[in-house]
Amino acid sequence: MSGVNEIRSTFLNFFAENGHEIVPSSPLVPRNDPTLMFTNAGMVQFKNVFTGVEKRPYQRATTSQKCVRAGGKHNDLDNVGYTARHLTFFEMLGNFSFGDYFKERAIELAWKLITKDFGLNKDKLLVTVYHTDDEAHGLWKKIAGFSDDRIIRIPTSDNFWAMGDTGPCGPCSEIFIDRGDHIWGGPPGSPEEDGDRFLEFWNLVFMQYEQVTKEERVDLPRPSIDTGMGLERMACIMQGVDSVFETDLFRHLIDATASALGSGPNEQTVASFRVIADHLRSSAFLVSDGVLPSNEGRGYVLRRIMRRAMRHAQLLGAKEPLMHRLVWALVREMGQAYPELMRAEKLIEETLRLEETRFRKTLTRGLAILDEKSASLKKGDMFDGDVAFTLYDTYGFPLDLTQDALKSRGIGVDQSAFTDAMERQKAKARESWKGSGEAASEAIWFPLREKLGATEFLGYETESAEGVVSALVKDGQEAASLKAGETGALVLNQTPFYAESGGQVGDTGVLLGEGGVKFRVTDTQKKLGDLFVHVGTVESGELKLGTALQLEVDHSRRSSIRAHHSATHLIHEALRQVLGDHIAQRGSMVAPDRLRFDFVHPKPITAEELARVEDIANDVVLENDEVTTRVMGVDEAREAGARALFGEKYGDEVRVVSMGRTARERGANALGWSVELCGGTHVRRTGDIGLITLTGESAVASGVRRIEALTGNYARKHANDTMALAKTAANELRTSIDDVPARITALMEERKKLERELSDARKKLAMGGGAAASNGAASGVREVGDVKLMARAVEGIEMKDLKSLADDGKKQIGSGVVAIVGVTGDGKAGIVVGVTADLTARFNAVNLVRVASEALGGKGGGGRPDMAQAGGPDGAKAPEALAAIEKAMAGA
């Protein structure tokens, strides 16, 4: 029973047998806490339960919670691999009581589990309590039989937990085990407490107070329990090993790494193997929960984790990307407990492969930049810390690699400046990171929602109804009436108008009343979750509170919206079939005339894949199967295979939309081919969609793709317009529609050939008879002191060709300097300066090109001592630029 998986199941089953609900781990991206970057404790998903904001159908719970501590306040990243217990990803086992049992029962359960079920030696255990918590002290004596010296009173915040400056709080009791005197360290509270001999593995938090203000603390009417046990630490104890990396799970991951590399860990390399094993876990779980590598926020932290592991893989001698080849081993170890790993396996592999491929390229580029930036430094100098950070931040070039590369030359790195730059970047990441909290609604809607309650939505059954005006709002204030020509918003007691949500736009239409009252609805919005607000203008009459109205949704528009919304479901499932189970929705927009669908995928979709997606979706349209909706419990829906939008918060009951007959008959899913949790409006049969045409595919963020599509008459019009364009192109090319692609290819090849010939002719002309330098020499070559200078201004030569001209010029003169200004058609200029190898000690091409650039109205320029380039906005100053180079050479 000492394996990680067995320990996890033993813990959960123990508390289930003692009346606790086993609650699945929440995602690593917190749904209900915008203050956190990542979930870092088991209580995070219950925060609103503890504060009384949210009610659950149970009062006792137990979980095994995925946690990440990397970035922000809790950051273990730099320690991982070099200590026995630090991890970026770990599992927190916990049991929770929401106003049910309290301190005595919590201690009883904990003691029974660790001594009976886990079989720990009582004589090796000791606990801490908050120094004023006499109750906990007495309970440990009573239940465990501890003597006073094994119940240590701690006066610091280590033994008092608080949710924040205000809110629930209370004392803690931590359970420790003495692992023996072969490990350095002392008991908690002693000078040697930072050692690893006495290992804390379970923290019991007794939430019995509420911090009202900084000075005022009161008793909670219903105290609660929150506990957290580190699974990896418990495995360490149960398996009798000194480090979490020696437990079965990590041994298997390290063995897989060794097998992939062809050699195992030794004293010099063991830290790298450990880093890879830990970072593989955090990277994989973050990707499976929807985080993808980027340069800001959560994605920035993930990229740091990934690239740190990839750097260690390279240190171990990996010649090719390694991380993606280890995912199978992680899925084998943890996929049973966390099915999301299995579902996202392909996405995780591809994300790691692409990131490591990019990283290897940036390493090569980074080394080249490092060489250039440090070229003028000598032994004992310090490399600029800001430049070191730019290498890290822009090129993914780690600081330790910069230090290693410069160490052999006796050059250090200004780490203080690097750290300052890092802190600025972290602040930027925090500012750019938008948490997961809901945006605050306008203040006016709070009292209205309190007074009116939720709006009854009738739109699933009808698009026409009667309603009564419950509230009117004008210019952000409640109003008694709206007159003809006035714009405002109104709330009805019931409505068939769909309010914008779930990506579907709000309905439009008209509201008609006696006496010629007509209100044109231009949008319908949802405030505070369930208050439907109709926005528009009074076209005639006067609208008053209590007015009875006939409510008419724009039926044609709603019909098109329904078709586009149902099409998004079919496209979603078709994408999964073509690209893999990792496909997960990240957003959508459903309008009457188009749709877009954003989803997780690490690379562009090929034309062939798009065609297959379109064909599969249209096959289901042609089935003309009935679209069914049913309301069921959220857990029942998920067990039935219903897809949910990542990060969306669902109630206890959800609406499930199913469509597609054929796959159901094959037994793929009992509910249908496409089954999603959805509150939107849909067609009655798939055939009502008419036709689905994919019109675009693009990237919207790192690892997130977007598909755009049309349905019905909009798709037909798009097809007709496309055919008309094809016919026009065929007529212009004097060929058939079928032969248009081949004809265009032939014309493009012919154009490329002519462009090459023209470029060659221009270069020959430039070197043989172009406008010469200011001295007027026909060849453009003159002596500056004892050095030849070929200085020419040419027109119609692209920047990329100027370098080859400079190379040709260097060959012609044998020894000297070549300066060529190319003037473009819009009057701008580019300049290239080349210096033959024998003269680079006297003349630096970078310095010369910068002088010329300044004369052209530009600044800067870069390259190598033997070849550099720059540009400027004023091509008319080409003679002055060449003269400036000559002057600079003369003064050298």
Curated annotation (Swiss-Prot):
User: What does the cofactor field's note say?
Assistant: Binds 1 zinc ion per subunit.
Identify the keywords attached in UniProt to this record, alphabetized. Answer: Aminoacyl-tRNA synthetase, ATP-binding, Cytoplasm, Ligase, Metal-binding, Nucleotide-binding, Protein biosynthesis, RNA-binding, tRNA-binding, Zinc
The UniProt entry's GO biological process terms, in alphabetical order, are: alanyl-tRNA aminoacylation; negative regulation of DNA-templated transcription
Query: What's the protein here called?
Result: Alanine--tRNA ligase
Record flagged with keyword Nucleotide-binding: yes
According to its UniProt record, this protein's enzyme class is: ligase
Note what the entry says on domains: Consists of three domains; the N-terminal catalytic domain, the editing domain and the C-terminal C-Ala domain. The editing domain removes incorrectly charged amino acids, while the C-Ala domain, along with tRNA(Ala), serves as a bridge to cooperatively bring together the editing and aminoacylation centers thus stimulating deacylation of misacylated tRNAs.
Localization, per the record, is: Cytoplasm
Give the matching HAMAP family.
Ala_tRNA_synth_B
Q: Which domain of life is it from?
A: Bacteria
**Pfam families documented for this protein:** DHHA1 (PF02272), tRNA-synt_2c (PF01411), tRNA_SAD (PF07973)
GO terms (molecular function) for this protein are: alanine-tRNA ligase activity; aminoacyl-tRNA deacylase activity; ATP binding; tRNA binding; zinc ion binding
Q: Which reaction does this enzyme catalyse, per its entry? A: tRNA(Ala) + L-alanine + ATP = L-alanyl-tRNA(Ala) + AMP + diphosphate
